[in-house]
């Protein structure tokens, strides 16, 4: 007798999606489960926003010898570009709470023979950052950016005048329902709460001077940047 597991998988997915719509704050346990399931396919799933990653890294304006933090570094897709930008005299610090995701990041930097990358396997609000940073990147890290304690801890590691760049999903204006259908579908696969999608960079604003926010993808994504006060 053949028994399909697809109904069970579908039920789990539906439960995760319903939770994201109900929750007013990120859920660490749910996020760990979500990225345990996604780790093997994450690189493929996020490939459509690679141009945003490249733009965000360019916006950091990194120079040789600088230190940069990649908050929520995931499988390490940004690490090689960041490491090359700061050179052997610089340093990259990747912070990621998912063991499955950071394992892939370790494999990536080992394959690239990078010796200037340090990985910290911890939630943002508990991460021990070993050095003061010149720059900080948040690339599609919605849940992390909604946790005030995590943002505060990461910002504390950035020197005054350091550059901070964030990208991710956001709700488009109400008159763009097709874009918001895309945002909702994409968010339900990658976050544990939809709260804050109207203003995802809210927790960054107290720390940044000269903050600029640019919309993209029909208003459904953003690139925000400024300098540490």
Model-derived segments and their meaning:
Residues 87, 145-146, 158-159:
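Helix-to-beta-strand junctions that scaffold the AdoMet/dcAdoMet cofactor pocket
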Residues 150-160:
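A short glycine-rich, Lys/Arg-flanked "PGG" loop and its adjoining helix->strand segment in the class I
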Residues 125-136:
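A short acidic, Gly/Pro-enriched loop at the edge of an enzyme's catalytic core
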Residues 69-71, 75-126:
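Class I SAM-dependent methyltransferase SAM/SAH-binding core
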Residues 22, 165-217:
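C-terminal alpha-helical "lid/dimerization" subdomain adjacent to the S-adenosyl-L-methionine
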Residues 224-229:
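C-terminal lobe and adjacent flexible extensions of AdoMet/dcAdoMet transferase-like proteins
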Residues 2-61, 104, 180-183, 187:
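Conserved class I S-adenosyl-L-methionine
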């Amino acid at each position: 007798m053949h028994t399909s597991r697809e109904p069970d998988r579908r039920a789990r997915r539906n439960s995760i999606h319903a939770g994201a719509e109900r929750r007013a704050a990120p859920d660490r346990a749910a996020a760990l489960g979500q990225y345990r399931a996604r780790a093997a396919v994450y690189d493929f799933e996020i490939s459509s926003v690679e141009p945003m990653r490249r733009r965000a890294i360019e916006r950091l304006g990194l120079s040789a010898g600088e230190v940069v933090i990649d908050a929520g570094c995931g499988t390490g897709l940004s690490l090689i570009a960041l490491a090359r930008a700061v050179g052997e005299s610089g340093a990259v610090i990747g912070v990621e709470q998912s063991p499955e995701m950071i394992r892939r990041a370790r494999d990536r930097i080992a394959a690239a023979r990078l010796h200037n990358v340090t990985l910290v396997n911890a939630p943002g609000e508990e991460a021990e950052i070993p050095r003061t940073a010149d720059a900080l990147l948040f690339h599609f890290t919605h849940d992390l950016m909604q946790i005030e304690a995590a943002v505060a801890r990461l910002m504390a590691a950035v020197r005054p005048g350091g550059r901070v760049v964030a990208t991710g999903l956001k709700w488009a204006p109400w008159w763009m329902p097709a874009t918001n259908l895309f945002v909702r579908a994409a968010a339900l696969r990658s976050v544990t709460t939809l709260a804050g999608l109207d203003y995802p960079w809210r927790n960054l604003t107290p720390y940044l001077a000269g903050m600029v926010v640019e919309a993209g993808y029909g208003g459904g994504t953003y690139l925000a940047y400024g300098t540490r006060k």
